[in-house]
């Protein structure tokens, strides 16, 4: 009998949620995703020292202004790590726009253009990149414009149906609904434990997946942020699942019989008129979990971006 991970790959595209090249070699995912927290973690791996040095040298060659050097070094490091990962995966790398731009459409678009340019200079076509943006109204609007330019986007920090619907209506290539962080909120709020079938994160992704398929939206659903393999098994059949190394290892070392739980609708019905900004903000605001977790997610990514910049500042000073 094939292990659980190999069975899962029959129904769902598996993506590695890591910047760790050794983990990617081990589990052979189709794609990989990174975020500011994972880049910070990866930057502390000794094997990546040369990638950091390259980013620092490049940044110094671009400008004499320290703030600009820091911005450039940070972007270049994320791209350098992405380029290394793309040597190992046949599909795409997701690289995230600075979380501090989550409420600035124009600056998010400018940062996306810069990341695409840096990848191009490194010999990587935009067809192998997904630009990650927070699923704020501004992030979704930025994605809408980028998609029209042929720059595919991954809308992340997605916790609510309103966010998912707006992303699909904007023509986003892919969304990353967060499963485990939804579970965290409900466990803390209710004091209850949930089995995988009733896990609020699993229920949320299932609802989004079914809505997309019923209404003929092409936006890819990629479940993210898992707390246990039970959540993953309950989402077998989802378009993609991005999974961290520890859970990939657990799946590879287990032999649980997998059957697809999410199955695409065979017929579609017309979607409703797209949400207006006012409708989106109201619907989103009605979900206290989503409001809390989006704000927290943006803050935490910004904190880790700041930690990375402290490390890079020290290196730029040398």
From Swiss-Prot:
Keywords: Cytoplasm, Pentose shunt, Schiff base, Transferase. PANTHER family: TRANSALDOLASE. It comes from the Bacteria. It is found in: Cytoplasm. Homodimer. Transaldolase is important for the balance of metabolites in the pentose-phosphate pathway. The lineage of its organism: Bacteria, Pseudomonadati, Pseudomonadota, Gammaproteobacteria, Alteromonadales. The keyword Transferase applies. This is Transaldolase. The active site is at residue 132. Pathway: Carbohydrate degradation; pentose phosphate pathway; D-glyceraldehyde 3-phosphate and beta-D-fructose 6-phosphate from D-ribose 5-phosphate and D-xylulose 5-phosphate (non-oxidative stage): step 2/3.
């Amino acid at each position: 009998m094939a292990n659980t991970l190999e069975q899962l790959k029959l129904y769902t595209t598996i993506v590695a949620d890591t910047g760790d090249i050794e983990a990617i070699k081990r589990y052979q995912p189709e794609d990989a995703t990174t975020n500011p927290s994972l880049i910070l973690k990866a930057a502390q791996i000794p094997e990546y020292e040369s990638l950091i040095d390259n980013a620092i040298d490049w940044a110094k060659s671009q400008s004499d202004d320290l703030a600009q050097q820091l911005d450039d070094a940070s972007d270049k490091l994320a791209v350098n790590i992405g380029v290394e990962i793309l040597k190992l995966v046949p599909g795409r790398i997701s690289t995230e726009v600075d979380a501090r731009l989550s409420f600035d459409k124009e600056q998010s678009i400018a940062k996306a253009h810069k990341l695409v340019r840096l990848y191009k200079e490194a010999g990587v076509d935009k067809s192998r990149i997904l630009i990650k943006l927070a699923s704020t109204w501004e992030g979704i609007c930025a994605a809408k414009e980028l998609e029209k330019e042929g720059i595919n986007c991954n809308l992340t920090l997605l916790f609510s149906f309103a966010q998912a619907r707006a992303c699909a209506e904007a023509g986003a290539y892919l969304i990353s609904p967060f499963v485990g962080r939804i579970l965290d909120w409900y466990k803390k709020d209710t004091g209850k434990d949930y089995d995988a079938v009733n896990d609020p994160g699993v229920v949320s992704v299932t609802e989004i997946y079914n809505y997309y398929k019923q209404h003929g939206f092409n936006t890819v659903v990629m479940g993210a942020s898992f707390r246990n393999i039970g959540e993953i098994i309950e989402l077998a059949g989802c378009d993609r699942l991005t999974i961290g190394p520890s859970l990939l290892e657990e799946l590879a070392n287990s032999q649980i019989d997998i059957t697809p739980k999410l199955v695409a609708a065979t017929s579609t019905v017309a979607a409703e008129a797209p949400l207006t900004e006012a409708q989106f903000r109201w619907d989103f605001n009605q979900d206290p979990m989503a409001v809390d977790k989006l704000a927290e997610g943006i803050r935490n990514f910004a904190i880790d971006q700041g930690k990375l910049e402290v490390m890079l500042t020290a290196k730029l000073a040398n």
